[in-house]
Amino acid sequence: MATVDGTTAPSSGGKTATVALESGGGRYGGPAPAKCSGANLALRALLFAVSLSALVVLVTAKQTVMVPFVIRPPQFILAPVPAKYTHSPALIYLLAALCATCFYSLITAISSVRLLSSSACSAKTLFYLILLDVFYAAVMASATGTAGAVAWVGLKGNSHTRWNKICNVYGKFCRHIGSSTFLALIAAIVLVLLAFLNAYSLYRRSR
């Protein structure tokens, strides 16, 4: 009986250990599922805040100054001349890009909150997010480039084309345009980071 008990105990213990190792290997040995991390949600919340701030700053880019017009030397009159973001197609394009990005960031942030409560993000969801993030990053980069070119001409002018600088007169207007362009650049960088983060999550899932 002692011999039977001695041989039975190791057998059952080895069996239990084998089951435990098999369950542990299935849990820890396989590739970890691609979970929607909190970093994804944080970046999308940051994207929404930055794009919304850039949008508000751009919409409020308005200034009216009194500019002297010579009638007959030495007579002149002062007339109000406004400067608005709607006067430039490049700034209108920036406005449209910011509106689209702000809406996109809000929708994806809400979706990220829902995905955080689930067990894992599907590979299909990650793939679509990568495509959308890259697309909006390209849109924001192009809009930032066009707005930056207009802002630079307004700041420095261009003597070859005889475009005079206006920021020495419309200081407030130029500050708004410059700030909005800088925030739009940050939004484009955040979108690139999101694309890399989702691509890494998809890579981990495929391993």
UniProtKB/Swiss-Prot annotation:
Residues 1-40, 111-124, 198-207 are cytoplasmic. Its main location: membrane. It is found in: Cell membrane. It holds the Pfam family CASP_dom. The chain crosses the membrane at residues 41-61, 90-110, 125-145, 177-197. It is a multi-pass membrane protein. GO terms for cellular component: plasma membrane. The keyword Plastid does not apply. Residues 62-89, 146-176 are extracellular. Coiled coil: none annotated. The keyword Membrane applies. InterPro entries: CASP/CASPL, CASP_dom, CASPL. Keywords: Cell membrane, Membrane, Transmembrane, Transmembrane helix. Homodimer and heterodimers. Belongs to the Casparian strip membrane proteins (CASP) family. This is CASP-like protein 1D1. The lineage of its organism: Eukaryota, Viridiplantae, Streptophyta, Embryophyta, Tracheophyta.
